[in-house]
A protein has these predicted regions:
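FMN-binding flavodoxin-like domain, especially the glycine-rich phosphate-binding loop
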Residues: 2-7, 35-41, 45-77, 84-197
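C-terminal segment of classical bacterial N-terminal signal peptides
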Residues: 22-27
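Boundary at the C-terminal end of the N-terminal hydrophobic targeting segment
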Residues: 28-32
Length: 197
């Protein structure tokens, strides 16, 4: 009879574990969960595809949701034309309107914010997101693709645009290296506490 009881208890504990409940040995009571899983979103704008590649690395590693920002008026493909437009937008404080509804960000605790480096900071669509979305109390962590400027002023601009949000350490990756950057992205996510150590 004792053998049957122990076996039955083990089966019940295994089934309960599969159902998502952890049990304290010998008690049959659920163990308290120490930390609720944080809901994570990657919000990004990608002009050439480099930032999108990093966003997809993050999604593959974490299973998080993606929000690809789309300006109402797409940017020109020509590099020099985009650089000129980005400079004007930054100087004038212009925030390009987005096609995306932004109210869904309220469901998330941690938002990783990705952008190409334009004039040493976030691209216009990302500045629009940071300036208009309800981000108070969220944890915001930037990642930037670049060709030599690194993070630039993006971390400082993030704190300026979202003073009531918490911010984490950013990641800068050269655009020419994004395809092979998965391990670097994984290390960054672990350091930020977004993946198990």
């Amino acid at each position: 009879m004792e053998k049957y009881s122990n076996g039955r208890r083990q089966i019940l504990m295994a089934l309960a574990s599969l159902a998502g409940g952890l049990f304290l040995p010998g008690t049959g009571r659920a163990a308290p969960q120490t930390q609720e899983a944080q809901r994570m979103l990657v919000v990004f704008y990608s002009h050439t595809g480099n930032t999108r590649t990093i966003a997809r690395h993050i999604q593959a590693l974490t299973g998080c949701d993606l929000l690809d920002l789309e300006p109402v008026t797409p940017y020109p493909r020509d590099y020099d034309t985009v650089v000129s437009q980005a400079k004007k937008e930054k100087q004038q404080g212009f925030l390009p309107p987005l096609k995306n509804p932004l109210d869904m960000v309220s469901r998330y605790d941690v938002i990783l914010v990705g952008s190409p480096s334009w004039c040493g900071t976030f691209a216009g669509p990302v500045r629009t997101f940071l300036s208009t979305a309800a981000l108070d109390g969220k944890t915001l962590i930037p990642f930037i693709t670049h060709e030599g400027s690194g993070l630039g002023s993006a971390p400082a601009d993030l704190r300026r645009l979202c003073p009531s949000a918490k911010t984490g350490e950013g990641l800068a990756i050269r655009g020419s290296r994004v395809d092979g950057a998965r391990q670097q992205v994984e290390s960054w996510l672990r350091k930020a506490g977004l993946l198990p150590a």
